[in-house]
Every structure is written in C-alpha cells, then in structure tokens.
Amino acid sequence: MIICRTPLRISFFGGGTDYPAWYNNNDGRVVSTTINKYSYINCRYLPPFFEYNYRIRYYKREETKTVDQIKHPSVRECLKFLKFKKGIEIVHNADLP
C-alpha cells in the first residue's frame, strides 16, 4: 500500500502561471501558500477475487474491469500512460470537503 499526503494549496492570484508551459512563453507571477489541511491518495493492489480490476474512489466510486471504462479522465490516462495491468484501488480523501 502506498499513502501520499500533500498540503492543500491556496492561490491568491497567478493561477496556472507557475507551469512551464505558461512561463516559458510568458511572464509568471504567483502568490500562494499551503495550509495545515491535506489531500491523501491511497493505492493498493486489489486481491484477485473481486469481479472488477479497478476501484477508484473520490466523490464517486468506480469499479471497472478495464482501464478504458474508468470515467475519471486523470486517473484513466495516468493508468494508461503507466501501462498498468494489475488490479488496483486508488482512493482520494481530503481534510476539507
């Protein structure tokens, strides 16, 4: 099992101007901070006895046989990019709603 914890970030202005795709061609100015609230991602291999291969939990719960059936676009494309074939559960939780 892998558990990741990341502090939640608050951007006051500047939005996405701290991404290389933007600041390589434009100026970027950002004022942001983090707070003492966190976002968590838990990942684990699924045991083989489930009827599905992928369980994704965020504000919805998805249980699918194939990666292509996953509706969450970021999760689906990450698993495709990583060529992930083994059953996995990915759960997102946060200290804030």
Each language-model region and where it sits:
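ATP-binding N-lobe of GHMP and related small-molecule kinases
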Residues: 1-97
